[in-house]
Amino acid sequence: MKRSYLKKIKYLLMLGISLLTVVSSVQSVLLARAPTGSFTHGYSGTAAEEAVSSRAVYAVSRLTDIRGMGIPEGIEKIADIATDDDGNFYLLTSDGRLFLLDGDFKLSKEYKITSADGEPLEITGARGILPMSSDDIYIADTENERVIEINGGGRVTREITKPDSRLIPEDFKFAPVKLERDSKGTLYVLCDGAYYGALLFSPSGEFSGFYGANTVKGSALTTLSYLWDALTKNDDKRAYSVKKLPYQFFDLSIDEKDFVYTCTGQTDNASSNGQIKKLSPNGVNILYKSKPDGTKTDAGSYNFGEASTEKRNNKTVVQNFTSIQTDERGYIYALDSTYGIIYVYDSESNLITAFGGGKGMQAGVFSAPEAIAYGRDKLAVADSQNNSVTVFSLTDYGRTLMSAQSKTLSADYKGSKSEWESVIREDSSNQLAMRGLAKAYFAEGDYKTAREYAKAGYDFVTYSQALGKTGSEFINKNFVWIFLLAVAVIGAAVIFTVEASKKKIVLIRNAKVRLLFNTVTHPFDSFNSIKYKNMGSLVIAAALTVLFYITAVISEMLSDFRFTSFSPLTSSAALQLVKTAGLVILFSVANWAVCVLMEGKGRLKEVFIVTAYATVPQIIYNLVFTLLSHIITSPSSTLLSGLSTAAAMLTGIVLTVGLMVIHEFSFPKFLGSILLTAFAMLLIIFIIFMLGMLLSQLWSFLVTVFMETAYR
C-alpha cells in the first residue's frame, strides 16, 4: 500500500514537470510566431517605453497578388511600390516592368519602356521608382548603373549615369536603389553600398555633391585601438585592418517643406539607435524625441524600434528599417523588414501606432516586405516573396487620433479636446490622449483634472505646471492662515528651545541613541566613543539597516510619479533589500576582511556599526525626498539634486571618519583599503554567483536523474 502511494506521487511529480516543460515550450513558440497586432509605446513607471496593445489606427482593406491586380504572369519579384502627387500607385518589378494601378489596385496601364529612339530598353535588377506624375517617372536601373526618366508613353527623356567628378572615388559603383526629388527639382539618388550619403543632381542633371552621410559613432575603445594600430603596425598591416564604415541609408523621403527623412538598416548585433533621421538643408539630423520630463533629446540616440527583440543562436536579430514615407501632416511611416512591422511616428518621434509583424500568408503579415508607399490615408506594403500588395486604410479611430495629435502639436488644445475624448472612449489606456486632454484642461484652467490626466499619461511638464497653479491658488486663498501658522510654529520652537536650555531638558535620555545623532555633527568624537568607550550599539545598527531598507521602499513606492520609476509589475522588494541592507552587510564583511590583512584594529561588529550609522543621512534624505516630490513643481528640480548630493557627501564623510578611527588608519591607508574593499566586494559577488550557478546545475541534474528513474 505504501509503495503504491509513493508510486502515485512519483508519477504526479513527473507529470507536473513534463507539463511545465511543454507549456513553456509552446509559449515560447507562440511568442516567436504570433503576429504583433496593433500596439504603441507607453510608460508604466519604468524609465524606458514599453510596447502596449492599442486599437487599430490602420486596418487591412485589401490583400491582392499580381493575379488579382490583373498583371500578366511571368514577372520577376516586386522591387518597389510608390505613389505620385495625385495619389496613384505604381508597381515596379526587378526586371524593369512598370505598372500603374487604379484606386481598386487593378492594372490601369503598363508602361512599355523604350529608349529615346523608340527602341525597347532592357532593364535588369531595377530596385527603385519615383513617380512625380503619370507623365514623369524616374526608375533606378540598378544593375545597369543608371537612372532613367520616362514620360507617359514610356520613352526615356533623360539618363543619368556615374558623374565624372573629383568628389567621387575611383572605386565608387553607381548602383542607384532609391530616388527622391524636392520642390526645386533637385534629384536625390541613393546607391547600394555607398556610405557617402545621397548623390545630388540639379534639375538639369548636373552632379552637385553628396548629401547627409551617416557618421561613425566613436568610443574610447575604438580611439585607443586606432592609436595602437598607428604605433604598432606598418602600412601593409594597416591595409588589412578592418575599417569601421558608417551604415548606409536604405531609403529616403522628402516632405512638403523639402526636409529629407532617411532610414538606416542595421547590419550587425549592436544596439540600434537613430534609425530614422530628419535632415536639414546642410545634412544635419534635426529630428528630436520629446521625453515626459519636457526635455527634447537628439533622436540619434533614440531607438525607433523595440527595446528587446528575438534571439537566434544566441545572437540578437536586429530590426532593419528599409523603407520610409512621410505625409502632408508630418507623420513618418517606417518599415522594419526583419519583423514586418510598420511604425508611424509624429514630428516629435512619439509612436502613434505600430502594426503588422509575424510571418505568413494571412492579411496583415508578410513573408518578405520590400517597400511601403503612402497616399491619401492608404498605406501599401509590397511583399517581394509573395508578389503581393497589402493595403492598410486609416480607421475612423485612427483618423480622430492623428487629427487630435496634429492639433495638440500645433497648440490647438481647445480644438483637440473633443477628439481626444473620443479616442479615450475607444481606448482608455491611450497615453497620447491623456497627455492631450491634460494640455486641453490646463488651457481651460481646470488644473485638478489636468493633473489627473497628466499623471495617467506621464506628462511631467503639464502636471508640474498644473501643480504650480494649484499651489498658487491655495496660497492666495489661505495666505493669512498660512502666515499665522508659520508664526505660531516658529514662536513655539523658539520658546521651547529657550526653556529647554534653562531647565536642561533632555529629549533623548539614552546615551547611545544621542551618540547616533552626534555622528553627523561630531563624527570624530562620536566614533572615538564607539571605539574606546564601547558606546556603539549593534541593535541600533541593525535597526538603522532595516530603516534604510524601509525608507528606500517608501521612497520608491510613495514618491511622486515624476521622480520614481516604481511599477508593481517590474519593481522588486527583494532587489531593494539587496541594494540597501545587502549592500551594508556586503561592505561590512569585505572591509573587515581587507582591513584584517592590512592590520586594521576594527572588529567586524565595529565596522558594521560604522557602516550602518553612515546611512542616517540617506534615511533622512529618503523621507524628505518622498515628501518634497509631491510639492516641487519642476521635474528637474535642483533642490532635490542638491539634497541628494548633500546626503551622499555626508554619508561619505561619516563613513570615512568612522573607518579611519576604528581601524586607526591614516587617510592614504584608508583610501587603499577602500579600493581593496571594492575589489573584495566584487569577488564575493562573483563567488555567490558561481555558487548559484552550481546549485542550479545540481538541481537540473537531480531533476534529470529523477525523470530517468521515473521512466524506468
Feature annotation, model-predicted:
Residues 587-690:
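Hydrophobic alpha-helical transmembrane segments and adjacent short intramembrane/lumenal linkers
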Residues 488-503:
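Alpha-helical transmembrane segments
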Residues 433, 466-467:
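TPR alpha-solenoid repeat register
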Residues 552-580, 625-648, 685-712:
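Membrane-helix interface segments in multi-pass membrane proteins
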Residues 506-605:
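Selected alpha-helical membrane-embedding segments in polytopic membrane proteins
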Residues 468-487:
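Juxtamembrane/start-of-transmembrane alpha-helix segments at the extracytoplasmic/lumenal side
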